[in-house]
Design a protein with these regions (language model features):
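Short, C-terminally biased terminal segments at protein or domain edges
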Residues: 1-59
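Extreme N-terminal, non-catalytic leader segments
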Residues: 39, 55-73, 77-78, 92
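Flexible, charged surface loops at secondary-structure boundaries
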Residues: 63, 168-171, 312-321, 336-340
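Phosphate-binding/switch loop-helix module in NTP-utilizing enzymes
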Residues: 147-189, 194-198
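Conserved catalytic-core segment of NTP-binding enzymes
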Residues: 180-259, 328-390
Length: 425
């Protein structure tokens, strides 16, 4: 029998503990968990000991001057966009030249005859990024694009497109990318978070909205899938009184699992609030007065369906609320106007009496009228609270302060092997 071939000896590992060298035609297979995409898995030919990668053009295109950091989440509406906004500002404050992009667009609007991603537009504007630091979204994830892909009408090779569009950014120190809503979203187009991270050789930071101690399970699962690409996590929306307990339980546990906890962000009512203008849009409401105060922020919802004495006690316990009540419940409307109310939403499309409108004008409280019943109105408002965005200037200031106080930017820079003293070009 012949002597078995000598096993291939892997090259010396990359010096960075978080970003191993991407595979090339001379390097062995590099695996980041069980979810590495087919394009980067090597084929082992029969009777050969060495591996021959089938996807080699990536490493040739990677610009050496910019690294990639992908911000993702374990579930939608975890605070990913807010984290991106706050983090990018901290990076700029450290003197780093940052580029930004969102490969999969979900919040699209039409501007000047073309579709733009609203999050990209807003964050780029907040950071004063020049055009060459903004990478357009590749794909709008909506019903139409999904149908086209499922019917086979869209045969685009998004992996190739991702390389061509995102790996040509040779300027700046860091390309900060906002990932999909969870680890699976985008898989239909080969653009899930693990796939994107693998293709562009990106480090990953995940944002997780805290719900209970069992929130660690989704992070452990993500670690299994992403492996060493996952360089850290941010635990968001934690009740302030529970943060000390998390520092003694979840933080050390995750660190033992080689998951760096870069920040534990306290729950903040302002960041979970919605503007009156957003409620007008979602409810298709008519504004009866104070259309100039639609920028007021609503932090809670109250339903005026009880007697007036109970309503007064109920309203006094709440702050910055939207009150939903029937257009014929004048006594409830009056009680709401004398408490911490940001807007009054009247159902049934019944107009309020003139003295209610006059008092609302004096107190600068918008009154909205909707052609809906109370239950449907409450459901829409609740859903709006569950899909909060950070497109108001007051929220930008808030998230910057939260991140500056509760996020370990120095540790992130160390994990990325970036120097805060780097000079801008």
């Amino acid at each position: 029998s012949s002597t078995p071939p000598t096993p291939h000896t892997p090259p010396t590992p990359h010096t960075s503990p978080t970003l191993p060298t991407p595979p090339t035609s001379q390097s062995p297979n590099v695996s980041y968990g069980n979810n590495a995409i087919a394009l980067v898995r090597p084929k082992i030919r029969k009777h050969q000991a060495k591996v021959v990668p089938t996807f080699e053009f990536r490493s040739a295109c990677v610009p050496k001057s910019a690294k990639h950091l992908l911000i993702g989440s374990t579930e939608a509406y975890s605070g990913k966009s807010a984290t991106v906004l706050g983090l990018s500002y901290l990076l700029q404050q450290k003197g780093l030249d940052v580029a930004y992009g969102k490969p999969i667009g979900t919040c699209l609007s039409e501007s000047a005859g073309s579709m733009v991603e609203e999050d990209v537009q807003f964050i780029a504007g907040s950071l004063n990024l020049p055009e060459n630091r903004i990478v357009p979204s590749m794909l709008a994830l909506n019903e139409a694009t999904i149908q086209k892909r499922l019917r086979g009408e869209d045969k685009t090779d998004y992996c190739q497109a991702l390389v061509q569009q995102y790996l040509q950014i040779s300027v700046g120190h860091l390309v900060l990318l906002e990932g999909p809503g969870n680890l699976e979203e985008g898989s239909l187009f080969n653009l899930s978070l693990p796939q994107v991270a693998e293709i562009i050789d990106a480090a990953v930071v995940l944002v997780s909205r805290y719900q209970s101690l069992l929130s660690v399970e989704s992070l452990l699962s993500a670690k299994q899938r992403l492996g060493k690409r996952l360089i850290g996590v941010v635990i968001n929306d934690v009740p302030a009184q529970q943060i000390p307990a998390l520092d003694k339980t979840i933080r050390p546990f995750l660190e033992q699992q080689d998951i760096a906890v870069l920040g534990i962000l306290p729950k903040n009512d302002l960041l979970r609030s919605v503007s009156v203008r957003e409620l007008v849009n979602q409810l298709n409401a008519e504004v009866l007065c104070r259309s100039d105060r639609l920028d007021l922020m609503v932090e809670s919802l109250a339903i005026g369906a009880m007697n007036v004495n109970a309503a007064v006690k109920y309203f006094r316990k709440r702050r910055n609320m939207a009150v939903v009540t029937g257009g014929d419940r004048v006594e409830i409307q009056q009680a709401a106007l004398e408490t911490s109310t940001q807007c009054l939403i009247l159902t049934g499309q019944l107009p309020p009496p003139n003295f209610i409108l006059t008092r609302a004008e004096e107190l600068e409280i918008p009154i909205l009228s909707v052609d809906l019943d109370t239950l449907t109105t409450v459901e829409i408002v609740d859903r709006t609270f569950g899909q909060v965005r950070v497109h108001e200037p007051v929220k930008v200031h808030c998230i910057r302060n939260l991140m500056a106080e509760h996020f370990d930017i120095a540790r992130l820079l160390s994990l990325l092997d970036l120097s805060p003293a780097a000079a801008l070009p």
